[in-house]
Amino acid sequence: MDLISTFSLHFLLLACSLPPGAVSLRTALRKSGKVGPPLDIKLGALNCTAFSIQWKTPKRSGSSIIGYTVFYSEVGSDKSLRERSHNVPVGQDTLITEEVIGDLKPGTEYQVSVAAYSQTGKGRLSFPRHVTTLSQDSCLPPAAPQQPHVLVVSDSEVALSWRPGENEGSAPIQSYSVEFIRPDFDKSWTIIQERLQMDSMVIKGLDPDTNYQFAVKAMNAHGFSPRSWPSNTVRTLGPGEAGSGHYGPGYITNPGVSEDDDGSEDELDLDVSFEEVKPLPATKVGNKKFSVESKKTSVSNSVMGSRLAQPTSASLHETTVAIPPTPAQRKGKNSVAMMSRLFDMSCDETLCSADSFCVNDYAWGGSRCHCNLGKGGEACSEDIFIQYPQFFGHSYVTFEPLKNSYQAFQVTLEFRAEAEDGLLLYCGESEHGRGDFMSLALIRRSLHFRFNCGTGIAIIISETKIKLGAWHTVTLYRDGLNGMLQLNNGTPVTGQSQGQYSKITFRTPLYLGGAPSAYWLVRATGTNRGFQGCVQSLSVNGKKIDMRPWPLGKALNGADVGECSSGICDEASCIHGGTCAAIKADSYICLCPLGFRGRHCEDAFALTIPQFRESLRSYAATPWPLEPQHYLSFTEFEITFRPDSGDGVLLYSYDTGSKDFLSINMAAGHVEFRFDCGSGTGVLRSEAPLTLGQWHDLRVSRTAKNGILQVDKQKVVEGMAEGGFTQIKCNTDIFIGGVPNYDDVKKNSGILHPFSGSIQKIILNDRTIHVKHDFTSGVNVENAAHPCVGAPCAHGGSCRPRKEGYECDCPLGFEGLNCQKECGNHCLNTIIEAIEIPQFIGRSYLTYDNPNILKRVSGSRSNAFMRFKTTAKDGLLLWRGDSPMRPNSDFISLGLRDGALIFSYNLGSGVASIMVNGSFSDGRWHRVKAVRDGQSGKITVDDYGARTGKSPGLMRQLNINGALYVGGMKEIALHTNRQYLRGLVGCISHFTLSTDYHISLVEDAVDGKNINTCGAK
């Protein structure tokens, strides 16, 4: 017996026991103290599986209420089986009670009532109310994040970053969880960190020399996404490889050095122990402890215990400290000031704002709050886009330790100094200059390059001093004990370290512009001050380092870093829709839209032969001519181009929701064709490098996952994409010569730089991409130096580039090299016969749209007669069909293919092809008659006799709406489905339809191209 039945029986017995004349049952119930129903009940669906309910305390609650019960059941179900209850205890002095009922079915209606309980039993039920949980599609979890990118930092650390998936589901993403697996050891995934509220992190405590894969899940209010595609397998560094330095400010160590320490090397203390007093979030897995650092969290050393919190109302007393004046910084109009705030207390007592961290300042006493990399402003609350870092004397940026540099390295740095002293570079075995290290510092405007292989310091000093406010380039080179410093391509200065050790152990990050422990580096580097000024470029061992914050660039962390180009565009005046972009720390360019050029996009021009320049960040874009499904299994590009540099993207398109892409690049002088069907990348590379400054013909194609590449007359290269997928879908434009954002390209696309050079022809699946009509967007695309740019073709003729030269396609009525001669009915008016005999040159055609002509090349019957001569084995004589052709489109054609004369037609149910073999390309006149009656066809050529054929299927009518072409047609390969690749090379003297309808070839034509007079040449 349930609770309700028990109370019902109790009150029924009470009523029956009353003597005659006693009060009524209702009065008895009231006097018994039965509690009334809860009041003001409110219901609301929370999600797919839960609803919320709220009510007020009943009015008549003479006895104290000890609890409530919520009764709920699915509407329309068997109540005795489906009704469920949920008990709710009473809080102290609570007039309004709220509760959440979960574990429900999505999109289901529920009936809900509430009853209160007192010491005397259950009160009366509230009036039933209804609520419906949200439908399933309203409660979707996020899509799986994109495949994470992993960077190995050391033998026990990796840096991880990822991007959200295609959609965030039915609610915003709240957090991520990160998992790992060791493919060589583990069979299941291990969770490292849950509820991570950023898209990058650093994982510490990994096993050295071990393979790892990482995956990410996203979570919103409705649950977790599927696991992302696992990262590529990475291997942590081995003990003999680059040092195991930590990452970011958390790498700062307890100095353990008193202020009177002489900084000399202690042979017993060469291996520094790195310790963090304030531990990062950690998760224990077995006996292994993994610590996690996010890019948004910075930690001080053990003496500098950072408190990353907002200042309280009892604000700290800020002390004015006498700091030596620094030269005026070159800031843009809207640059963000870097506020490194100095306090008169240690980090143990200092409170720093969010996005900042505390470091004890041993030089001036007290402590400083430093802004994290990418943050600035007085409260470190402003975002800073860093490309050319600016340093203020207390700033620094960290990169991964120098790799493969223990024996030799080369570093090139371009900088502009605003103060005479400061540390530019440091990397070593310890944070404080003990043991092995290398450094570059400014000391009284001279550059000091120092390194120590473990038995003595080499000091190499530039012979000339730098000029403050001017740009300088310095190159450092070391091989074993020997070092070299070269400033501004001047005479190199050399030196040698002491002792016999010739290798350097690099464990710390590579610091640029300063170091968190610069105070302790004075003995090693010669200065305890940070650099003041800007850095424009940094190269290590011949590779340019992207100084943007990771994961876009290689900068792992930093403090109080500004952007040198900030405000550079404030005074720029880019017109005609141009936008400003910094290309150096102190200069900008205008990104001019198509059709404009110049310093400020002030010059309008007609784009003819596009010229792309890497220095101008050029690119153009054109949509795919047809829907993506037309290119799923087959794509072919023919490109004629002239490269001016050995690297750059020629063409690129991709799919935003998958791994699909295709790209054509210049790479080290070769052409690379890359494509991915979603299961692996295929890479085809030309056998020989291309000659720069010359025109080249390129053809690439892919059928399913098989690719072909051919450049000029080089050997054809074939290759195959990995995996089992065979289709490519690209939903973006086709980008030519560059892309708008190089951070968004697929990682295996090989796209690194814009193309420098010219492109004069692009044909996609036989369809020409026209520069004037098909380019829809782009920036800084100019005209190449080419004859077509000068519009040499007169009378409306169009210039067709042919590498260094050109050809003119002349309109009907004009001929000559530049369409300068008027012809047609007037050019040879002394020879009447010549007017009627047009000459075709392979890219010529005549077009007819007269209804009296068209009706004779359609319907149930057709009869055509021609007299022609030609010197080519291939060429189209006649064509009428749908444009563009579709599968089983109606058409009728007559032409030469490989020397044979072929009459073809399709009535909608299959193609009929009737062939006559012979020597028809002998330059002599030939007569051909093609007749069709329903499905049956016949062709007669000279005296060769008739050949007959029949089209398959049941269709008997030729239904066509297009024009009639004679001698060729526009984009012939495209519109004939590659049945013909060129027009007639020769002449046509007679053309008759329906046995007696004679057509004047030139006079009756509505349009034509490249028609000369037969016999004139």
Swiss-Prot record:
SMART domains: EGF (SM00181), EGF_CA (SM00179), FN3 (SM00060), LamG (SM00282). Residues 1-24 form the signal peptide. Glycans are attached at N47. Expressed in the outer plexiform layer (first synaptic region) but not in the inner plexiform layer (second synaptic region) of the retina (at protein level). Strongly expressed in the photoreceptor layer of the retina. Moderately expressed in pineal gland and brain. Weakly expressed in lung and ovary. Its main location: secreted. One of its GO terms (biological process) is extracellular matrix organization. O-glycosylated; contains chondroitin sulfate and heparan sulfate. Pfam families: EGF, EGF_Pikachurin, fn3, Laminin_G_1, Laminin_G_2. Disulfide bonds join C347-C358, C352-C369, C371-C380, C534-C564, C569-C580, C574-C590, C592-C601, C788-C799, C793-C808, C810-C819, C987-C1014. Keywords: Cell projection, Disulfide bond, EGF-like domain, Extracellular matrix, Glycoprotein, Heparan sulfate, Proteoglycan, Repeat, Secreted, Signal, Synapse. Residues 37-136, 144-239 form the Fibronectin type-III domain. It comes from the Eukaryota. Disruption phenotype: No morphological abnormalities. Knockout mice are viable and fertile. However, the terminal of bipolar cells do not appose to the synapse terminals in the rod photoreceptor ribbon synapses. The signal transmission from the rod photoreceptor to the rod bipolar cells is less sensitive and is delayed compared to the wild type mouse. The signal transmission from cone photoreceptors to the cone bipolar cells is also impaired. These mice show reduced visual function. Impaired stability and postsynaptic targeting of GPR179. Residues 343-381, 565-602, 784-820 form the EGF-like domain. One of its GO terms (molecular function) is calcium ion binding. It is found in: Secreted, Extracellular space, Extracellular matrix; Synaptic cleft; Presynaptic active zone. GO terms for cellular component: basement membrane; cell projection; extracellular matrix; interstitial matrix; photoreceptor ribbon synapse; presynaptic active zone; synaptic cleft. Residues 386-564, 609-788, 835-1014 form the Laminin G-like domain. Interacts with DAG1 alpha-dystroglycan. Interacts with GPR158 and GPR179; transsynaptic interaction is required for synaptic organization of photoreceptor cells. Involved in both the retinal photoreceptor ribbon synapse formation and physiological functions of visual perception. Plays a key role in the synaptic organization of photoreceptors by mediating transsynaptic interaction between alpha-dystroglycan and GPR179 on the postsynaptic membrane. Necessary for proper bipolar dendritic tip apposition to the photoreceptor ribbon synapse. Promotes matrix assembly and cell adhesiveness. This is Pikachurin.
